[in-house]
Each structure stands twice: as structure tokens, then as C-alpha cells.
Amino acid sequence: MHYSFTEKKRIRKSFAKRANVHNVPFLLATQLESYHDFLQEDKIPSQRKNEGLQSAFTSIFPIVSHNGFARLEFLSYVLGDPPFNIKECQQRGLTYASPLRAKVRLVILDKESPTKPVVKEMKEQEVYMGELPLMTSTGSFVINGTERVIVSQLHRSPGVFFEHDRGKTHSSGKLLFSARIIPYRGSWLDYEFDPKDILFFRVDRRRKMPVTILLKAIGMTPEQILENFFVFDDFTLHADGAEMKFVAERLRGEVARFDITDKAGKVLVAKDKRINSKHVRDVEAAGIKQISVPEDYLLGRILAKNIVDADTGEVIASANDELTDDLLARLREGKISHIQTLYTNDLDQGGYISQTLRMDDTNDQMAAKVAIYRMMRPGEPPTEDSVEALFNGLFYNPDRYDLSAVGRMKFNRRIGRDSLTGDMTLSNEDVLAVIKILVELRNGRGEVDDIDHLGNRRVRCVGELAENQFRAGLVRVERAVKERLGQAEADNLMPHDLINSKPISAAIREFFGSSQLSQFMDQTNPLSEITHKRRVSALGPGGLTRERAGFEVRDVHPTHYGRVCPIETPEGPNIGLINSLALYARLNEYGFLETPYRKVEGSKVTDQIDYLSAIEEGRYIIAQANATIDKAGMLSDELVSAREAGETILVSPERVQYMDVAPGQVVSVAASLIPFLEHDDANRALMGANMQRQAVPCLRPEKALVGTGIERTVAVDSGTTVQALRGGIVDYIDAGRVVIRVNDDEAQAGEVGVDIYNLIKYTRSNQNTNINQRPIVQVGDRVAKHDVIADGASTDLGELALGQNMLVAFMPWNGYNFEDSILISEKVVADDRYTSIHIEELSVVARDTKLGAEEITRDISNLAENQLARLDESGIVYIGAEVTAGDTLVGKVTPKGETQLTPEEKLLRAIFGEKASDVKDTSLRVPSGMVGTVIDVQVFTREGIPRDKRAQQIIDDELQRYRLDLNDQLRIVEGDAFQRLEKMLVGKVVNGGPKKIAKGTKITAEYLADLDKYHWFDIRPSDDTSANALEAIKESIAEKRHQFDLAFEEKRKKLTQGDELPPGVQKMVKVYLAVKRRLQPGDKMAGRHGNKGVVSRILPIEDMPHMADGTPADVVLNPLGVPSRMNVGQVLEVHLGWAAKGLGLRIGEMLNTQVQIAELRKFLAAIYNESGKTEDLDSFSDAEILELASNLKNGVPFATPVFDGADEGETRRMLDLAYPDHIAKQLGMTASKNQVTMYDGRTGEAFERTVTVGYMHYLKLHHLVDDKMHARSTGPYSLVTQQPLGGKAQFGGQRFGEMEVWALEAYGASYVLQEMLTVKSDDVNGRTKVYENLVKGDHVIDAGMPESFNVLVKEIRSLGIDIDLERD
């Protein structure tokens, strides 16, 4: 068994009963693959598939001019290098993007050519097409300096859908069937029945029209229409009646309207009897082919064909005419003997199309097309050309209508065609086929579609969304190019004169900047990042809206199994509309979600893994992952629990065709991080999954004692940790860098094998949390490829660590844990367990105003000395300064307009002879309630404006740092090269070299040591291989030096050039403050099971309840929070955490008493190898066992995977192992070892009952009291009501609302109430009067009329009611 570098240091004991058969796929694959397929950057133009950008270009080009003599053809596109890297874009507020250039060819044809078109001239050119944002390696985009995520959209798949209204439209509850053809791009075509069973169609939800108009418009005659939808009855007319061709099947269920007799005259079915199967058999046995029917049997029947007089050619009757006595008489007159009528009945062969045809008043194809034109363009006069153009453009023009490959596949599959490919536009056969199926549905045959089935909803990823947007931009360009192409020849234009890239840039910018699906990345912790990128939303353009989405769309559907998580979704109006991908889900080529299953053949479970989409899954019987399998891999139970077409059934093993790959395949990443999820109620599990995403990274992350085993995957895939790209030995580390000397077998020949990893230090995330990476390797450590070498935010030894392990006691304590409040020990705060660092970015801009330029300066009048002390000569705060609310960070003055001077100002100006008041102080100050340390300052200056000293100093420091970095890299690279060189040269025979070494001499290490290293290259080895290798290394070092010099020069150029700033901005300064937030009352905390609460009190350690050995609890929770919430998982977690800590203490004790290694190995084997997944501890050396043990002494981490976790017996065994009887007795444990006797810290007395105590992984959430609490002194008022504004951002007050008024009324506090509703609120004159009275020392309130009363009066007047206030 292979262990990675970090796994060896701390193995998580797994209780999984089932071996891992399929690894969790890379969690960000959906986003990265989608955008990669969109760009196809790594493919040469000739090998690019017709998708993404390539598809967008080929669908628009070639663009042909209106006269047809000039065209612009697309050849290929290329993406340039982005001008700035990701970090620089974030600092400067730029978009991380590549310039896109397309190679196009302008072809001009000879107008004079008499024969076929002759090319007159061709011009090829690369044209700039705007900038395309690039995706970072972690699946996000940097847009205007902030990281954003494009969320995938779950929308209704293109294709055809049949549904009914569930009886909601008509009062009788009759089902009204409808069908809808949804293209990927173009007009929607709807068919629907009305309550009278007439079939209508509508285009793009416009006015409805009879469907036969559409059928006529596609070229069908009434006869053809009836022939396609009905079977016919044949009649031969006689003078006194008729004979009907007998079809026995059509009689069943009918009531006989006359006696049916055989040839001998025997009555087989008597009149008015219902014909059953026996009657049909009797009639067939009698061999009857024709039946005589009375004349009234024909009346009311509908003719199927036009009837024409053979002699005169006159139409006697038209198709769809009803037979009447008159018509029959005319037919006999015309000597018509044979007629066909439509066969209809009330049960399963309705005459719907015939009735619709009767309503239709159009006569021919043109009239039908004109009717459609009038419906689409009311008020416009139809001409023949415009009518044809509109009709063909609706469904038959590839430029305006695109069903897409998915739509065609879904369409063909639904209407029962064998081929899944075809044209991307509709054909006449398609239109007809859909109507036929809809009529069949109305006749009671077939099933309607379930629109919430995941086979009918597909996912649009970043690549596809960006492609649609890019295509929209290209369409705008196409229009402009068409106009200009006509002048191309006359004006001798080049391709770049024709194409204006602005519409494309605007479309792309709008999509990435302000689309509903382009969201500000949730970067609170690594889990929130990864979840945001795996999110699928039903909202957004072309999707649903919150208001219109019903209950069914939001509900969990059987097809969600293994594709979309049934647990993780927001609470509130978006519930069920925003979902998360399940752990193993992926997208197929059509964009449908699919999930992996193991193939089962003849009840044997194979290792073959197939991905099935929701539609494919419906055809199979699939067993669950927890089905019992014997050693031979056979399903051993008599009956196996399985799923078939969404239903759970019990089947025999032989019928099973597939089996789940893992028990946790149903849930998403966040839900799979909850241990004992199977014991939690779904509502609370939802809260648990959502709240983990809000956990703030702690100062010192601590791994969860009870995890699920997926923590490592999440930490690595999120990109927060640093992984080794190649294996090797750690050569050098410091806080900001790790250097690895690559293994010889992984380094390429002649290349200098050194990898340098620069770590992210104290960087601000989107949510102002701190991103900081720390190395977890030491010099000399050997690491393999993909090993974790540095931890990031919220990770501990390469595992996700969102919170801290707290010793939790479930007991009430003086009401401080009433209603989910949390009582916390002071020790937790003192040890900085939940302290987090938040980085705030404060910025100020100096603009060019009408009155003159604003200036960033230290020279500000009326600024206190202690404030100035922190500013340098440029007026910018020093790094390292500790600042509090109101302190000046950047001094700035703004020119002020000339105003009337007061006498005092006139005096000052007379004395000092200067303008003392023409500028006002607009400095950047620390906002209220913030205390922190300045950790970084960035100064950006527009091109052409001289830099101040601070800006220059920042650039010089950055360049110096970069040069040191490069020098270090060069030193390491050269050191590595010379080391390899020495290894190669020692012992080799030379032809000559420095220090007059004789030919044929062997090189020794001493000889090399005496030489200057650069003279080694002058040695001439006798064998060619060594000589070539020597030359290669020499060139490699020279090349590296050259690269480093170029890199430095490029960096210098970037730093010294002016910065891109918004219009009118001369200079911008950004100051970064690090704020340390300790845990305090009012902060929100939560476990992983939805057990959330607010810290009510931080209690001195001596008052906390403690155990017999004096260990105090860290957290006291209310036991009443468990039963009604039904999240028992937290109790099981506490028990297992208690065992984990106890085992750690025992290992620590063994290390302290220095027991034999063999005994330590035996104890570790008892923990790891007696149940669940076993570990290969024998492969560990003694040193590795000791290192493992020392990492376990704070607790042995457990993994209890979702739906496959530890059972009661295993928890009990671990508790017995952790707390032998003598320890259990000392601690006053119960026999089960689940509860402990606790003592009151204040009195020292034992509590009456034993208490459940153990370790729970507890999180501090991003809802911190510091961000929410503020106090208002004097602040802004609302313009209309003159009441104080609300909210922290507006420096507002608390609203004294209706219920608060009741409270004061109840107390009879009339004067308090009066001042609350008047002078403290919106009585403008009263407010001023109170201030005047206070200044005079007269403490009297003169309450006047509140402004809100005047507003009320005005509103009543606006209703037209004259209302006036009568004053006494």
C-alpha cells in the first residue's frame, strides 16, 4: 500500500467496510474541461474540433456581401500571452485575459466575369478580436481584479416534450395535452388541445391557430392530412343501403346498431347489444367479409377523400365533409358506388384533426402561410416574398434555427427514430411526427414526459455559456461587416478595416462582468470555493425565475441519485433551484449528468465501471453499494435491495445488472464531509452542509478528530495546498518558498532539475479572510510527485480543517445555553483557538476635479501630531503601524470652491497672507469599529504623472525582492548543476584542462575543489558523452541566466510603466489592514450537523464544569438541542471523538515512558487493523512509526465515511481501547464509557447526573458580531421621512417600530415615547430646538410635528382626498 508524504505522518483510521473501487474524480474537472474545450488552446488549428470558439467562428463565417461579389472567410484563431499574471491582475484591478486574434481572408470576385465566379484578389490578415478571460488553474476567473466563478446552468434540454395540464385548466378536470419543440436557438413551436378537443399550434407563445394551417403551410392537402391521422372504413353504395368492408377489431366495445347475421341468416349479434371478444370471434369464424348496413348507419360519417364526378370532373363532395341524406342522394345521382369514411370512436380513435380541419378557413398552402405571417407580424402587409422568407426563416433556416446535436438526439429518440443524428433544423416529417404522437396521447396511447427528469434537463457549463455570448458578439459584427463588404473593393480595404472588435469585447465583458451566472467567488474557505465551482443553478438567462418556479422543479427527483445532491441547497427562496453536483457525477458529451456504476454479470460484481445518464439508468436494475458481496465477488443475499425506473424494489441477485460504486455517491462534497450523516435528519444535514462553507479559517487549523476520509481530496483539489510537481529532495525552505531538487529520473537530460515553489503569504480573499500558505516539509525530506508540501488556509497536513476539536459537555448551565446559546471556556479564547485574521482593503483615489487636482500629501491643516506621526513624507501610512477607528491612513486634500469668507478667516488670511481654506481634508481614515495593523500598501500612478517617493520606494523594494529571488534561484540552480557535474566528472579521464592537468589523468574530487567552479567547463573529458553532457550543462546555466535577466527586465518594465486607472483618476492608494478577531459573545458557531448557536458567555476556566481529573470542558451545549432536531450524528461524533482523544493520550503516555517500539506497533495495530480498513504498518520504519505516534498523541483521527461509517460496536471497542477500566474508574465514567461524572467549577460538587462528554469538531462562522454591531451618534437622515437611516453601512440607527411603541405604552412611559417618536426621530424643528435648549442649559423638550405625519398627509392628498390639519 502506497502512502504519500503527509499520509505517513498521520494516518486516518477508516471504518469503511467496503474497499474503494473507484477514486473520487478531480473535483474541478467540470469547469476546467469545459473551458479547455471552449478555447482548444493546445491544439493546432487544423486539429481543432468544431466546438467552442471554433464553432462560433465557423457558424458565422464566411460572411458574404449583399451583392455576392466579396466574402470574408475565417481561417484560424490564436490566443496571445496575457500581459499580466494573475497576481498582478488582482493587485491592479485588471482582467486576466489573452488577446484573441483571428486569421481571416478577404476574397473579392470579378464582377465582369461572364462565366462562373472568378477570384479577382485575396487578402489574408490577422485581426484583433478582443480579449478573452482565461481560467485560472483552480477554475475561477479574475475579472477587474476580483475572482469570479461562472456557475453551470441546469436548463430544459432542447428537443420535443409532451405534457398535460394535470386537469388544472378546465373546471371538469379534463386533461389537456400539449407538445413543445424547444430548439437550442430559434422559435419555440407549441401544440395544444383546447377543452373542445381542437388541436392548435402557436409560435413563440403568440396567438394560437388551428394546427391544420401549419400542415397546409408545409404543403399538405386536406386529403393527405386525413390520410396521415385516420384509418378508413370502405363502403359500397346500393340503391337501398350499403355494404361495409368488415374489420372485426373495430367492432369490439361498440353497441350494434343493427342485427349482424351470417350467410345463413343466423343472428350472431343482436341489435343494441355491446359487441365483445366472443362476438368478434364468432363473426370472424363465419368468414364474413362484407356486412350490409342500413342507410342511417352512414349518416354523420366523415368523408376521407374528395369525390369527383368521373364524367364532368366536378367535385361532388370534399374530404372532411359530413354525409347527409342530400349528399348521399347526390352521390347516387353521380353514380358513385365506392366511398371511404374516417373511422372514429369515443374511446381510442378521436376525430380531433377532422374537427380542427373544419375550423380552418384557409384554402391552400399560400393562404396558410399568409395566416401565419399575419399572426407573427400583425399590421404588416404580406407580399409573396416576405411571406415565404418569414415561414422558411422560422424553422428551416440554419442561421435562425438550431436544434443542436443534443436537441436532434432527444427529438429522434422521443419520436422513435433509429438514427440519433440529422439536420439541425426542422423538417416537414418532424412537424408531422410530433402531431401524430400528440394525437396518440389524446387517444390514450403513450406516456407524457416528466420535465423534472434529469434526462430532460441538461447542464450548460462555462465553455458553452461563453461560446453563446461570443457568438452573439460575432452576429453583431457580421451585420456591420456585411455593410462594409460592398465597399471593400472600391476603397481597397483590408480585413482589419472591416472588422470592429468592440461588439465582441462588449458581449464578453457583459457576460463575465454582470451575467446572473457570473458570481463573486465565495472564498471564505477551500470548501466554499470548491462548492461554488460545482454548483448548478436553474436560474439565469434562459432558465427559471424564483417567482415562477413551482414545487415540482425544486423537489428531489429519483434521477438526482448520484448526479445532484439531495441535501445541499440553500434555504430560502432559492431552495431546490440551486444544487450541487454529487461527488462522482460528471457530464457526458451532450451535457447530461451521469454517474458511475459497477457492472454485475450473473450476480458477480465485476470491476468494470460504466457511467450512465438518467435515461440509460432507467433501463437497468441497479443494486445499492451496501449489498453484501462474498469473497468471490458474488451478491450473496437471497433478495437484494435495488432500484428500477426510480422505484426501490427487492430482486433476486441474478436480475441485478449494475451496482453503485460507493455508498457516498449520492451526496455532494460538503455533505460527504459530515460524519454520521446517515443519523442526521435531512433538514439539519442541509444546514450542516451549508454552514461548513461559512467556517472562517482559524489561526492554527486543526484536523477533525472524526472525519469522513474525503478531507484530503477536498484540500488538494481546491488548490489551497501546494503539491510537488515532480519528486525530489527538499533543498531549502523559508516562510515564503520551498525549493526541491528533482530526482534524476524525473529531470530531463541537460535540464537543471530544480523546482521552486513561491507560497502565498497573508493575502486577502473575496470575503476578507486570510489566505496564507505554510511549508510542512523540512530540508532533506524526500517527496514524491503530487505530495503536499505546503498547507493553505483551513488545511492541516494536507487535510481540510475547518474548525477546532472542542471538549463538549451536553448539560444546561445557568440558562447560558438556553435556545441554542453556547457557553465557552475562557481557555479557548486565551489559547487563540478560534482567533482568525481578516484582511481589509481600504482604498483612496486622487481625481482631477473641475476646481483642480486632488493631492495625496502629508501637509494637512488641523491634523493632530499623533496622526501625522504614522504618515511618511508622501502622506501614506507606514507598514506595521497599528491603527484604530478614525486614524488617518492616507492624507488627501481636495480643492474647495470659493465661498464667502467668515470674519475669522479674513483675519487669518490678512495675517498669514495665504489661502488657508481653499482645500478640504478628504483623507482616508480607518472606518468605525476597526482596529488592525497595516500589512501592505500599493500605490498606482497614471502614466505621465511623476511618482512620489513612496511609490518609487515600493517599486524599488519589489524589484530588489525579485532580484534576490532570482539570485537565490540561480544559486540553487547552479549549485544543483555543479553537484551533478561533480558526480559525473569524478573518475573520468581527461584530454586536458585548467592547472595544466596532463592528458590521461583521472579527475579527483580534490582537483575539482581547488578549481573555481566556472573553470570546470574548461576541462576536456576524453569520452564524448561526458564532453557533450558538460557542454549541455554549461549551455543550460547560460540559458537560465539569460532567462532570469529577461524576466527581471520584464518585471522592471511592468513596474515602471504607468498604471491603467479609471478616467479622471490620477493616483490610487490601497492600504491593507490585518484585523485579528478573537472569539467573543455574539459570534455564531456551529457543528457539522446543523447544530448552530450563538456564543452567550465566555466563562472563566475555574467556573467551567470539570471532570474528576480537573479537565474542564471547552464548550457546554444544551442537551435539548438534540432530540427535536433529530441530528443524532453529533452525539455519535462526540463519542467517537472522545475515543480518538483517549487513544491519543495513551500513545502520548507510551512515548513519554519510552516503551519498546514493538509494544507501540502492537498498540497501533490494535487501533488500525482490527476492524474497518486495514493499514500496512509493517512497511513503516521505526523512525516513521515514532513520527506517526508523535503526530497522533493529540488524538487519533478517525474516518467514518458517509453511509459506511463506524457502528456502535466499533465505537464501543475504541472507547474500551482508549479508556481501560482503571482510567474509566478514575474519571467516574459509566459502564458504557459514554458518560462522565462532572463537577461544578464554582462549588466543586459533582452534578447529580452523569454527562455526555467528548470531542466535537466545532466551527466559527463568518457571521461575526464585530461586523454587525455598531453605534450611531449623529448621522444621516432619510430625505423624505427625515428619520435616521438603517443599517451599519449607512451609519444608521435601530428602528423604534410598532411593537417597541406598544412596550412603552404598556409601561405608561409617555414622555419617553414622545421623545422617541419626535425629537429623537423625525421632528426636524424639535431636534434643532432641543440642541439650542441644551446649549442654553434649559433641559426642556419642545416636541413638534413629526415629518412622517406630513408624509402621510401628502400621500392621502395624492389619492385626491383634501385633508388639512386644524391647529388649536
Swiss-Prot record:
GO terms under biological process: DNA-templated transcription
Cited Pfam families: RNA_pol_Rpb2_1, RNA_pol_Rpb2_2, RNA_pol_Rpb2_3, RNA_pol_Rpb2_45, RNA_pol_Rpb2_6, RNA_pol_Rpb2_7
Gene Ontology molecular-function annotations: DNA binding; DNA-directed RNA polymerase activity; ribonucleoside binding
EC category: transferase
Annotated keywords: DNA-directed RNA polymerase, Nucleotidyltransferase, Transcription, Transferase
Signal peptide: none
A single cellular component GO annotation: DNA-directed RNA polymerase complex
Record EC number: 2.7.7.6
Catalysed reactions, as listed in the record: RNA(n) + a ribonucleoside 5'-triphosphate = RNA(n+1) + diphosphate
Role according to the record: DNA-dependent RNA polymerase catalyzes the transcription of DNA into RNA using the four ribonucleoside triphosphates as substrates.
Quaternary state and interactors: The RNAP catalytic core consists of 2 alpha, 1 beta, 1 beta' and 1 omega subunit. When a sigma factor is associated with the core the holoenzyme is formed, which can initiate transcription.
Family that this chain belongs to: Belongs to the RNA polymerase beta chain family.
Protein's name in the database: DNA-directed RNA polymerase subunit beta
Gene that encodes it: rpoB
